[in-house]
Amino acid sequence: AESRTSPLSTERVLQESFADVCFRTQPGAPYTTLREIAFPDWREARSSLRTTNFLSAVTTLSSSRLIMVLPKKTADTLANAGLVAIVETQAKSVVQTPHLIWHHRTDQDLAMQWVRSVLFSSAQET
């Protein structure tokens, strides 16, 4: 039996089912998952739950064996609240550059560009 303290291998991870966060990379594009972007080797994993909002899946996660790929700070916050358990894996995620999600019509709007710059500056200070 595998120890809970040893990181899970990709082979072992692929035996489990995922709760996947889905999103579109651009308007009209097919949905992709955070799992597929962060861990390309896990692309073939079984998805038992797909959602566009990870918060809606948290209660399901806490009462199931589903695995969900989340940003580290989000996972830490949910784990500290006792809502999820963090499972270490041998695979390392692809480094992601954070992006703000904006509707394509507001992308060039000067006021929205200013709002994004304020958010970006604030995020760099923390």
For each feature predicted by the language model, list its residue ranges.
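Acidic, proline/serine/threonine- and glycine-rich low-complexity intrinsically disordered segments
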Residues: 1-5, 45-47
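Short secondary-structure boundary/capping segments
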Residues: 10-11, 39, 76, 90-92
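Short secondary-structure transition/capping segments
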Residues: 24-26, 67-74, 95-104
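A late-sequence structural motif
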Residues: 4, 20-21, 85-126
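Hydrophobic hinge/microswitch elements
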Residues: 27-29, 33-86
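Conserved short hydrophobic patches within well-ordered secondary structure
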Residues: 13, 19-21, 66-67, 78
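Secondary-structure junction motif
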Residues: 8, 14-42, 72, 108-112, ...
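Residue-level preference for short coil/turn positions at secondary-structure junctions
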Residues: 14-15, 62-64, 94-96
